[in-house]
UniProtKB/Swiss-Prot annotation:
SUPFAM superfamilies: YhbC-like, C-terminal domain, YhbC-like, N-terminal domain. It holds the Pfam family RimP_N. One of its GO terms (cellular component) is cytosol. GO terms for biological process: ribosomal small subunit assembly; translation. Belongs to the RimP family. It is found in: Cytoplasm. Required for maturation of 30S ribosomal subunits. This is Ribosome maturation factor RimP. Its main location: cytoplasm. InterPro entries: Ribosome_maturation_RimP, RimP_C, RimP_C_sf, RimP_N, RimP_N_sf. It comes from the Bacteria. Keywords: Cytoplasm, Ribosome biogenesis.
Length: 164
């Protein structure tokens, strides 16, 4: 969509305001091409518990709340599709603030540098120490319980994970 970046912020503000009543917030907004049409994809998550599963009914309500409002911002004759979806159960944790909200959650972590011979793992985010600015993780290697203290700047990639 032409000039999408110029209206993305407005869409984000409007959608977040409308979704407050459903206790949802925007995770990400994308402009995609689908079958030669522009698609605005709005990924949402629960406002209080970022990794809470969302059911189809709440996504339908979210779509109903915002679809006409977005038309007021997008002043074009160009056709577009609107998709409101869950941000997903294994979404990326993009900031230190998001990781603080992920306490007691199961995550997959890749580190920039090895710590105690560990470069990647799946485990629980057990605590955040504000004084040292470190996160504690609990995980298992070959059945042995391990803990690791990691600073945010040593995390290369982190996302929620599903524990099997």
């Amino acid at each position: 969509m032409k000039d999408f970046e110029s209206i993305k912020f407005q869409i984000n503000e409007l959608v977040n305001k409308e979704l407050e009543v459903l206790n949802l917030k925007v995770y990400e907004i994308n402009n995609l091409k689908e079958f030669e049409n522009d698609m605005i994809q709005i990924l949402v998550e629960d406002a209080l518990q970022a990794n809470k599963p969302l059911d189809f009914d709440i996504l339908i309500k979210a779509n109903d709340l915002v679809s006409n409002k977005i038309d007021q911002i997008i002043k074009t004759n160009q056709k577009y599709l609107l998709e409101i979806s869950s941000s997903g159960i294994e979404k990326q944790i993009r900031s230190q603030e998001e990781l603080i909200k992920a306490l007691d959650q199961w995550v997959y972590v890749q580190l920039n540098n090895e710590i105690k011979k560990v470069k990647e793992f799946e485990g629980y985010v057990t605590k955040y120490n504000n004084d040292t600015n470190t996160f504690s993780f609990l995980f298992f290697i070959k059945g042995q319980k391990k803990t690791l203290e990691v600073m945010w700047n040593n995390i290369k990639f982190i996302r929620y994970a599903v524990r099997f």
